[in-house]
């Protein structure tokens, strides 16, 4: 039986009173068909598949996680209480009648399984790998929802890519990055930048036609971006772009089918177009607030993105305003840098470094940040956007940082053994479900897998519990 942790976490100061509750939370430690001598030794990542299967007769909703450990990738079914993840009020017209002919809602008709049972179907059963990336350590995975050719892409620690398909255990396409003199051990494990040169990343365009991946070339001179076909000839390298003056481009994200940005260790975001010359369209320089460690772009709107720093600072931006500032010469007659201002500035408590950022795929205003401690912060920027609505233009008052923080931090999750602070060890260990709003999966270094959905202050008030 999975362990229930309904007492963990605390919601942010969005409204009061704000309960410290979960709508659902389940955890379990997988068992494996092959012997694993030291589970802590293996790198772990996870991502969700997008399929959801409701079963009204059982009162359940089934979806699945893709979980990697070393070179092995597993699929883990997650069975959830339907009532928790489905809004009965949206479909009242389809309510059934009872035997007396009286109308009754699905809430009354649908069983409500106990919380904490999401992994009961796999609890105690040895897992067998769905896919194997032989000889590699998986560092990131992405599910390909609408691809006819492949089911998922996995990236290894050395920057290689592999495409996997259901029912086939080995990769169907590979982009291999060979380990040679340019990627010798002493270069990958740089003494001047420990561990940083091992960082690589990839992202898939909105239409799934193109992959962009970033990596170090191993010489500690410049990082590399590779634009790769994911349509007609998956795995074919279309173009290679060198990013001068950067050792590592540690994050890449698409904004749409062609526009993407890379985030480098020189604290500069560069915005590119896959169809144009090998120079960025424009840049955003962030020399303050510590090292620029992560960023993500919204998948609901093409314009919003968030940056995170080693000091725990988080900034929300509008790409249109950033681009416009590069052409505005009003205050730059003497060659000054562009004045590029963020929409909002937030922070992790205690200076907890920002190691990962995940924009919601179901909401234009929500995103999640992951701290170096492993803590997960849930943010909703609706309050900030409503203050800057055009209808309120004449009465806009800039919110104080504490006010903005209290209104936008809607939930805070502390999970399992996520206590060691390793800047690059926590990337890709938290995943937002692409269909179920606010549903999160996490994996800890000891392989503890947790799935949870917060019970938010707005939900609490909406159900009549506020005073």
From Swiss-Prot:
Residues 1-12 have a biased composition (Low complexity). The keyword Membrane does not apply. Residues 87-100 have a biased composition (Acidic residues). WD repeats lie at residues 244-282, 287-327, 349-389. GO terms for cellular component: cytoplasm; cytosol; nucleus; Rpd3L complex; Rpd3L-Expanded complex. Residues 1-22, 84-121 are annotated as: Disordered. The keyword Transport does not apply. GO terms for molecular function: DNA-binding transcription factor activity, RNA polymerase II-specific; histone binding; transcription corepressor activity. One of its GO terms (biological process) is DNA damage response. It comes from the Eukaryota. Keywords: Meiosis, Repeat, Transcription, Transcription regulation, WD repeat. Transcriptional modulator with roles in meiotic regulation and silencing. Present with 3750 molecules/cell in log phase SD medium. This is Transcriptional modulator WTM2. It comes from Saccharomyces cerevisiae (strain ATCC 204508 / S288c).
């Amino acid at each position: 039986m999975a362990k229930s942790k309904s007492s963990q976490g605390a919601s942010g100061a969005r409204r009061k009173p704000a309960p410290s509750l979960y709508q659902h939370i389940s955890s379990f430690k997988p068992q494996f068909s092959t012997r694993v001598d030291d589970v802590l030794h293996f790198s772990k990542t996870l991502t969700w598949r997008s399929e959801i299967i409701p079963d009204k007769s059982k009162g359940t909703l089934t979806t699945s996680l893709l979980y990697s450990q070393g070179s092995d990738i597993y699929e883990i079914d997650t069975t959830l209480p339907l009532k928790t993840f489905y809004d009965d009020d949206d479909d009242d017209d389809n309510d059934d009648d009872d035997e007396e002919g009286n109308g009754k809602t699905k809430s009354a008709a649908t069983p409500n399984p106990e919380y904490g049972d999401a992994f009961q179907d796999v609890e105690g059963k040895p897992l067998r790998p769905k896919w194997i990336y032989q000889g590699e350590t998986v560092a990131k995975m992405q599910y390909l929802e609408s691809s006819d050719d492949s089911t998922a892409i996995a990236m290894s620690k050395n920057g290689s890519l592999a495409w996997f398909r259901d029912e086939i255990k080995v990769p169907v396409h590979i982009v291999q990055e060979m380990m040679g003199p340019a990627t010798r051990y002493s270069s990958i494990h740089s003494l001047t930048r420990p561990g940083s040169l091992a960082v690589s990343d990839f992202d898939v365009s909105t239409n799934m036609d193109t992959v962009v991946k970033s990596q170090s070339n191993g010489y500690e001179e410049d990082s590399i971006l590779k634009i790769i076909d994911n349509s007609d000839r998956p795995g074919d390298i279309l173009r290679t772009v060198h990013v001068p003056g950067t050792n590592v481009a540690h994050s890449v994200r698409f904004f749409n089918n062609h526009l993407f940005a890379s985030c480098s260790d020189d604290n500069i975001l560069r915005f590119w177009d896959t169809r144009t010359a090998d120079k960025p369209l424009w840049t955003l320089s962030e020399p303050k607030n510590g090292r620029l460690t992560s960023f993500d772009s919204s998948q609901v709107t093409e314009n919003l993105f968030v940056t995170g720093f080693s000091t725990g600072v988080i900034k929300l931006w509008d790409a249109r305003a950033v681009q416009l500032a590069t052409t505005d010469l009003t205050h730059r007659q003497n060659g000054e840098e562009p004045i590029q201002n963020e929409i909002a500035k937030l922070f992790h408590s205690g200076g907890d470094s920002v190691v990962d950022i995940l924009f919601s795929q179901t909401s234009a205003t929500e995103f999640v940040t992951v701290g170096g401690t492993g803590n997960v912060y849930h943010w909703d920027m609706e309050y900030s956007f409503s203050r800057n609505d055009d209808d309120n233009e004449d009465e806009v008052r800039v919110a104080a940082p504490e006010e903005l923080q209290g209104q936008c931090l809607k939930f805070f999750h502390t999970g399992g053994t996520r206590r060691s602070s390793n800047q690059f060890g926590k990337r890709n260990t938290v995943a937002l479900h692409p269909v179920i709003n606010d549903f999160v999966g996490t994996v800890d270094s000891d392989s503890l897998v947790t799935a949870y959905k917060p019970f938010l202050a707005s939900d609490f008030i909406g159900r009549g519990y506020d005073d």
